[in-house]
């Protein structure tokens, strides 16, 4: 499945944004847009539907926070965590993982600005 990933920062400091409108306008099954920088981190919004590939981030932790719908964070070793709206999880650096959404989910991610969304 192709991923539609935009690492460019869409909004500057003090610029208001509507993450819901961005997600609503998304017409592809797997989309990710960097919203803004916060110090050395970046906030991204994603629309997930389907499976991302297994990967890890060697130097950065990654926060996933479900805004709408539900999705799974599958972890190496067989553990799978389901997140529903208003639930989140931090995946520590070095942990092999993938996200999986049987139906459409809208997700906020916060991570170091140096992270590669597709993994190291």
Describe every region a protein language model picked out.
Residues 93-120:
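Ligand-binding loop in jelly-roll beta-barrel domains
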Residues 77-93:
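Short acidic-glycine-tyrosine-enriched beta hairpin
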Residues 43, 52-54, 69-74, 88-89, ...:
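Short beta-strand segments in beta-sandwich/barrel cores
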Residues 39, 67-68, 84-85, 103, ...:
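A cytosolic small-molecule/anion-sensing beta-strand core signal
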Residues 41-42, 71, 79, 95:
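Short acidic/polar mixed-charge low-complexity motifs
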Residues 47-48, 57-74, 110:
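Short, conserved beta-strand element in jelly-roll/cupin
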Residues 28-29, 42-58:
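Conserved short histidine dyad/triad with adjacent acidic residue
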Residues 1-44:
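A short, N-terminal "cap"/entry segment at the start of jelly-roll beta-barrel domains
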């Amino acid at each position: 499945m192709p991923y539609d990933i935009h690492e460019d920062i869409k909004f500057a400091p003090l610029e208001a944004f509507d993450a819901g409108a961005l997600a609503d306008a998304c017409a592809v099954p797997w989309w990710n847009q960097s919203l803004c920088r916060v110090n050395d981190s970046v906030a991204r919004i994603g629309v997930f539907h389907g499976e991302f590939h297994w990967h890890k981030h060697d130097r950065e932790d990654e926060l996933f926070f479900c805004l709408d719908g539900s999705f799974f964070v599958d972890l190496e070793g067989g553990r799978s965590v389901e997140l529903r709206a208003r639930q989140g999880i931090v995946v520590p650096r070095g942990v092999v993982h993938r996200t999986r959404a049987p139906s459409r989910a809208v997700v906020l991610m916060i991570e170091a600005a140096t992270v590669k969304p597709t993994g190291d």
